[in-house]
Amino acid sequence: MSRALICSLALLAMLVISGTYASPAANAEALAAANAEASAAANAEPLAAANAEPLAAANAEPLAAANADPIAAANAEPSAAANAEPLAAANAEPSAGPSPLAAAQDPPVVKMKG
């Protein structure tokens, strides 16, 4: 045997013993497993995000609207009515009768007999 062949076989034996060299079948299996895990993770995360966001939005908006509307309506309606009616009454009542300023400026006319 030639010296180069013996060195090559010795090097190959050392690599196999140390575990650095693996057969092509073992390499292919490891690559397939690594690719499958990476593909599953890469596909699962975007799918989970794509499904979760529309569901969260679809559930949150009607709940928020259903909870907010009655509260806002319950608070706004009495306040509007409570504020509008006294203001309207306060504005309408003084203008219904004679102005106190007009009465103070125009003293009553007194006719003298004689």
UniProtKB/Swiss-Prot annotation:
Residues 82-96 have a biased composition (Low complexity). It comes from the Eukaryota. The modification Pyrrolidone carboxylic acid is found at residue 105. Residues 23-104 form a propeptide. Keywords: Amidation, Pyrrolidone carboxylic acid, Repeat, Secreted, Signal. Expressed by the venom gland. Sequence repeats lie at residues 22-29, 30-37, 38-45, 46-53, 54-61, 62-69, 70-77, 78-85, 86-93. Residues 1-22 form the signal peptide. The modification Lysine amide is found at residue 113. The keyword Secreted applies. It is found in: Secreted. One of its GO terms (cellular component) is extracellular region. Residues 22-93 are annotated as: 9 X 8 AA approximate tandem repeats of [AP]-[ILS]-[AP]-A-A-N-A-[DE]. Disulfide bonds: none annotated. Residues 82-114 are annotated as: Disordered. Is a minor component of A.samariensis venom. This is As-peptide 126. It comes from Anoplius samariensis (Solitary wasp).
